Amino acid sequence: MMDEQRKAEYESQSLQLRAELKQFEAEWAQKNDGKKPSREAIKQNPDIAQKYKQYNKLRDILSGKIPPPTKSNNQDPSQRKRKQPETSLPSASTPSKRNRSAATPKSQHYSAVHEAITPDVARKLFSPAVPSSIGPTPQKDGRVLGLFDLISHTPSKSTDETKPRASGFTATPSNRRHALDLENDKDDDDHDEKDGKEFITPSIPRHRNLDRTPSSGRNRNLLDSFLGVRATKTSTPLNKNTGNSPSKNNLTKTPSGERSVSKLQFATPAFLRRTSAPLPPVDENGEWLDIEPLKLPRKPFSIAKGKGLSSVVASLRKMEEEKLDEELDMLREMEAMEQGGMGPPPPKQTVASTSEDTEKKKQVTDPAGAEVVPEEENSFEEDEAALIEVEASFLESPSSKRKKERRPVLLSGFDDENFYDSQDEEDLSKEGLDRNGQPLRVFKKKGQKRTTRKVNMRPTRTKRPSAPIAEEEDDGEEEHNDVIPETQFDATKNLDGDDHHTLDSLSSGGSGSEFDDGSEGEDEEAETSTTKAAKAAAKKKAPSAKEKTKKDATTETKKKKGTKEGGDEEPAKKPRMVKATANANFKRLKLKNNGAKGGPAHNSRFRRRR
């Protein structure tokens, strides 16, 4: 809490400053048409700007936002006494008083010391490839920078405190350094870092990173870590005290030892190394060693295009078998030479040849007609078979024998194809048998079904009328003289199966197909009915004499009754007359799906709308 006295002092100061600022604003408004001063105008007048800052500070103290300053902080820095007496300073020395409040405060950061020492080759080799540009965005080595990264720090003080300084360069000579020799420069530098720093004239140091975009220390460390550059002070491997480095303090030469030029040219970058173990140091003064060939990884086993793994394994198995067969042939030749200069052994037997040999052995005939095999050949074949069995049993492992006993052997890439291959199905199909020897089922080829109706056209044969019917017609000619026989319907023709010569067909004069009411389907049905009737009539026998007499009697009685009742004969049916204007275009079509969309009145112009 503030005292009442101090609070009154702050209030009086704030009122006085407020009155001065109001007077300034009034004068500014008179000059600028009643406008208030802008921030740029206030910044151009440093006295008024200072008064604004002081007034805002006093208002914050009175409101409690800022604690009141203590007496030590409130004291003017110009009133401070010197810690060292003036007698200790030389007469020509620059006064040691420095206005440190003018310096821009900056956060502590670690500068990469080795950047001035490590060559550019190392930075390129030991850092990942970064795109040089991303676009119009402000960036540094491919990394986008923010607004605060573009602010450069004040160059009033060197950012590198460990940078070696030449003795007496842009520095005020102190009383201690004035009496010392150049040999004790290093000891004086260590001692002056504590006491003599205050007597150095502020100067603008030479920045070695003038080609880089200025950024804050924190972001620079992040960028250095991102680019693979170490930013600590102790991480740079400096020159060791070896024979490669001539002097300790010669920092302008390329460092040797672990990071030599020869190593920088051929070393693998850190992010590509598989092991983090350090490499042995390279002696630059030694002889140049030949570069060893690169040990590249083997190409993966690639299967040929269109081949599976089983086919590849089978081909490898065949190659191994061929190699073993060659070795076996050589063994046979050696055995033949040892046995007494016998001729060369017979060629190796395939599965087919062995099967033929077994069949020959099985074919046992009479001694007179049997083919006697010489004993020498039999003995040689037996020895060879025994040798093959011994080799097979030697090569087979007990586990494989057990597996063979347990389950049947399956065909794989390591088996002989000829041994397991069955008879070709093509040969069996030629014989008309399947695998089991059963006759194959004959399948009919399925093609497109018929789209039109198949009609078998057969000639129709007409038969002459029988004798009794003709006699009856002769007897009744007198009664029916006025009737034309060509126009009358003949029942005998229908019985014989001749339906073509109807009254309609006669009256149409050969053009019944054009003016017939029936459609094509009806014509086809008529044709089939005629053929069936013709067949049925051919099968039937001629009627007996009794049946003929009965029919004649019935017809006579019917005629007599008709004459008695009607007085006159019934008029004959008139033939159908076809108009001369009749045409096939005017014939009504009898469609099968008529009425499928709503009856005959569908889409009709002269029907009532529903």
From Swiss-Prot:
Residue ranges, annotated region (Disordered): 28-115, 127-261, 338-610
Residue ranges, compositional bias (Polar residues): 86-110, 232-261
Compartments, record wording: Cytoplasm; Nucleus
Chain intervals with Acidic residues compositional bias: 373-386, 414-428, 470-480, 514-527
Record-level Gene Ontology MF annotations: DNA replication origin binding; single-stranded DNA binding
Main location class: cytoplasm
The keyword Cell cycle belongs to this UniProt entry's keyword annotation: yes
Matches recorded under InterPro entries: DNA_rep_checkpnt_protein, Sld2
Domain of life assignment: Eukaryota
Keyword field: Cell cycle, Cytoplasm, DNA replication, Nucleus
GO CC, alphabetical: cytoplasm; DNA replication preinitiation complex
Basic and acidic residues bias (residue ranges): 28-42, 493-503, 544-573
UniProt function note: Has a role in the initiation of DNA replication. Required at S-phase checkpoint.
Family, similarity comment: Belongs to the SLD2 family.
Protein's UniProt name: DNA replication regulator sld2
Organism (species): Neurospora crassa (strain ATCC 24698 / 74-OR23-1A / CBS 708.71 / DSM 1257 / FGSC 987)
Gene: drc-4
